[in-house]
Curated annotation (Swiss-Prot):
Record key words, sorted: Nucleus, Phosphoprotein, Repeat, Repressor, Transcription, Transcription regulation, WD repeat
Gene: TUP1
Stored Pfam families: Tup_N, WD40
Physiological role: Acts as a component of the CYC8-TUP1 corepressor complex which is involved in the repression of many genes in a wide variety of physiological processes including heme-regulated and catabolite repressed genes. May also be involved in the derepression of at least some target genes. The complex is recruited to target genes by interaction with DNA-bound transcriptional repressors, like MATALPHA2, MIG1, RFX1 and SKO1.
Region (Disordered) residue spans: 124-278, 387-409
Protein name: General transcriptional corepressor TUP1
Extra remark beyond the main annotation: Present with 5840 molecules/cell in log phase SD medium.
GO BP annotation list: DNA damage response; hyperosmotic response; mitotic cell cycle; negative regulation of dipeptide transport; negative regulation of DNA-templated transcription; negative regulation of transcription by RNA polymerase II; positive regulation of transcription by RNA polymerase II; protein polyubiquitination
Predominant place of localization: nucleus
Organism taxonomic ancestry: Eukaryota, Fungi, Dikarya, Ascomycota, Saccharomycotina
Length: 713
């Protein structure tokens, strides 16, 4: 009995072991199959992603080649058109000159025939008077130059008769030579001249042969056609060198003087009438139908920024700043300096927290966080190892070498000049001569700062190609994002707070997943990226400006290019130089861009947001071009209600623009160097009465400003 039970137990254990072995075998096969499939899946996925990236790069290269070829063809066509226009102009000028010469020759021949007929009739009907005494002249025509037998010629021995009561002059008939005109009776010529005066005032007569009138002696006291007085320079240029040139007689000169005086009298009232109109040129407003045009004059009040010459009603002046108001518009904004924050170096960027309570600034090696209400320093963030790592990365990396003139050259990209790539900070650095105090590698400028939506974290981008995520309260780095191959110039958080977009000189825009610290999407373009922005609300779109003068808008989920806003649009209203700042309007329907071409532009994106109708402009069109800055535009921002646009420039000024009309409302001069960065605060950190904005400058200052709307005077 016991043996039977034992055998049964052993058999059961064997069966269980067999089942266990079978289960383990199946599990191993399943794991092997899963791993193999996972590897195949990952391999195929990576291969497809690589192919997509290759296709995208190929498309971008083709696009770049197309643009270059198009530019070359357009330049060649431009030169050819210019050549054709010049040739047509020359042909037209020659045709007009030939016609005038023919008309003048016909008129001279007619005058000669009429005078010959009159003289012939007079000599046939009136007895010959006593011959006047012969006159000797150095300009008399030699006998060898005369020809006998001409039907209309007079004998050499005969002289013109003296006619009693006749209006004919008693002077002898001159020979018409090169650059001289045939004589006519004075009173008759004066009448003809007054009736037939035509421009140009100095008539050029085609040369005639000395044998036109046979035997007619020449005299120094000759008479010519009176003509309208020409400018002295014209007379000097057209004065013939022939000694036989005729002179204008006293009567002709009197007629000329009278005509000239009358002409001047007619011109002077026109000039006097134009003077009052010029007084109103200071009141220039942009015509509504020219809002998008790039070629517009700068409003006159912005041309001369000397506050001493401006009336008190059109300015506000203190020891630290002054404001010039547009005289053509009512004064509706009052701006005051709230706090001035001194820094040890150039302030490259300023950015408010989402609630507007804090302001972050970036300068050399450090990032500061200030409380807006009182300007107190909340935190100073600095990575002590950053400068050393930055220096080592430059000296140890074989693919990157540092050269003079602040130029970085890499083996995989084209040469990028720091001054061209980062005029915002580098222009100020050049002015301050910062690179003379230390080697370029010892500087580590914080190019961009951005608060997380909840205000707990701060992202910073710098020259060492790293993005640091700081815990503001603990003043510690919680994450470092690596992947860019050149300086990082711009950052922006997504509204959800779990993603970040960055733009770099390595010609890429990258979207980072902050939950994993990995790059989730890379967008490549043909030139360096200078600025990026995320659309408000859902963060559906990202915009980027670059050195190729274009603003691109992508779908942040798919990476598809939605819009390309540049000078190649149908209207030709795009930027003419590199774009250095972009920002979405608060409603997300438009993009504002600032460029080195000294302009600010407002681009319509309503069709891209699927909210367009027949009354709205086409997607991607430039609605307004704001002209007023006299140097590079380095930063742009919009107010909370999108009523105004602010722009900072290398001309040291901040302009308030009326968004709809395109007119500048005021110019704020509050810095002694380039205004590199401008930011507008959300909320009301200084109370409901004031709105707040901040500026960062190459004068090593960041300033917090407050403004409010006032009732028009």
């Amino acid at each position: 009995m016991t043996a039977s039970v034992s055998n049964t137990q052993n058999k059961l254990n064997e069966l269980l072991d067999a089942i266990r072995q079978e289960f383990l075998q199946v599990s191993q096969e399943a794991n092997t199959y899963r791993l193999q499939n996972q590897k195949d899946y990952d391999f195929k996925m990576n291969q497809q992603l690589a192919e997509m990236q290759q296709i995208r790069n190929t498309v971008y290269e083709l696009e770049l080649t197309h643009r270059k070829m198009k530019d070359a063809y357009e330049e060649e066509i431009k030169h050819l058109k210019l050549g054709l226009e010049q040739r047509d102009h020359q042909i037209a000028s020659l045709t007009v000159q030939q016609q005038r010469q023919q008309q003048q020759q016909q008129q001279v021949q007619q005058h000669l025939q009429q005078q010959q007929q009159q003289l012939a009739a007079a000599s046939a009907s009136v007895p010959v008077a006593q011959q006047p005494p012969a006159t000797t002249s150095a300009t008399a025509t030699p006998a060898a130059n005369t020809t006998t037998g001409s039907p209309s010629a007079f004998p050499v021995q005969a002289s013109r008769p003296n006619l009693v009561g006749s209006q004919l002059p008693t002077t002898t008939l001159p020979v018409v030579s090169s650059n001289a005109q045939q004589q006519l009776p004075q009173q008759q010529l004066q009448q003809q001249q007054l009736q037939q005066q035509q421009p140009p005032p100095q008539v050029s007569v085609a040369p005639l042969s000395n044998t036109a009138i046979n035997g007619s002696p020449t005299s120094k006291e000759t008479t010519t056609l009176p003509s309208v007085k020409a400018p002295e320079s014209t007379l000097k240029e057209t004065e013939p060198e022939n000694n036989n040139t005729s002179k204008i007689n006293d009567t002709g000169s009197a007629t000329t003087a009278t005509t000239t005086t009358a002409t001047e009298t007619e011109i002077k009232p026109k000039e006097e009438d134009a003077t009052p109109a010029s007084l109103h040129q200071d009141h220039y407003l942009v015509p509504y139908n020219q809002r998008a045009n790039h070629s517009k004059p700068i409003p006159p009040f912005l041309l001369d920024l000397d506050s001493q010459s401006v009336p008190d009603a059109l300015k506000k002046q203190t020891n630290d700043y002054y404001i010039l108001y547009n005289p053509a518009l009512p004064r509706e904004i009052d701006v005051e300096l709230h706090k001035s924050l001194d820094h040890t170096s150039v302030v490259c960027c300023v950015k408010f927290s989402n609630d507007g309570e804090y302001l972050a600034t970036g300068c050399n090696k450090t990032t500061q966080v200030y409380r807006v209400s009182d300007g107190s320093l909340v935190a100073r963030l600095s990575d002590d190892s950053a400068a050393n790592n930055h220096r080592n990365s430059i000296t140890e990396n074989n693919t990157t070498t540092s050269t003079d003139n602040n130029t970085m050259t890499t083996t995989t990209t084209t040469t990028i000049t720091t001054t061209a790539m980062t005029s915002a900070a580098e222009l100020a650095k050049d002015v301050e001569n910062l690179n003379t105090s230390s080697s370029p590698s010892s500087d580590l400028y914080i190019r961009s700062v951005c608060f997380s939506p909840d205000g707990k974290f701060l992202a910073t981008g710098a020259e060492d190609r790293l993005i640091r995520i700081w815990d503001i309260e603990n003043r510690k780095i919680v994450m470092i994002l690596q992947g860019h191959e050149q300086d990082i110039y711009s950052l922006d958080y997504f509204p959800s707070g779990d993603k970040l977009v960055s733009g770099s000189g390595d010609r890429t825009v990258r979207i980072w997943d902050l939950r994993t610290g990995q790059c989730s999407l890379t967008l490549s373009i043909e030139d360096g990226v200078t600025t990026v922005a995320v659309s408000p609300g859902d963060g559906k779109y990202i915009a980027a400006g670059s050195l190729d003068r274009a603003v691109r808008v992508w779908d942040s989920e798919t990476g598809f290019l939605v819009e390309r806003l540049d000078s190649e649009n149908e209207s030709g209203t795009g930027h003419k130089d590199s774009v250095y700042s972009v920002v979405f309007t608060r409603d997300g329907q438009s993009v504002v861009s600032g460029s080195l071409d000294r302009s600010v532009k407002l681009w319509n994106l309503q069709n891209a947001n699927n909210k367009s109708d027949s009354k709205t402009p086409n997607s991607g069109t430039c609605e307004v071009t704001y002209i007023g800055h006299k140097d590079f535009v380095l930063s742009v921002a919009t107010t909370q209600n999108d009523e105004y646009i602010l722009s900072g420039s290398k001309d040291r000024g901040v302009l308030f623009w009326d968004k709809k009309s395109g007119n500048p409302l005021l110019m704020l001069q509050g810095h002694r160097n380039s205004v590199i960065s401008v930011a507008v605060a959300n909320g009301s950190p200084l109370g409901p009465e004031y709105n707040v904005f901040a500026t960062g400058s190459g004068d090593c200052k960041a300033r917090i400003w407050k403004y409010k709307k006032i009732a028009p005077n």
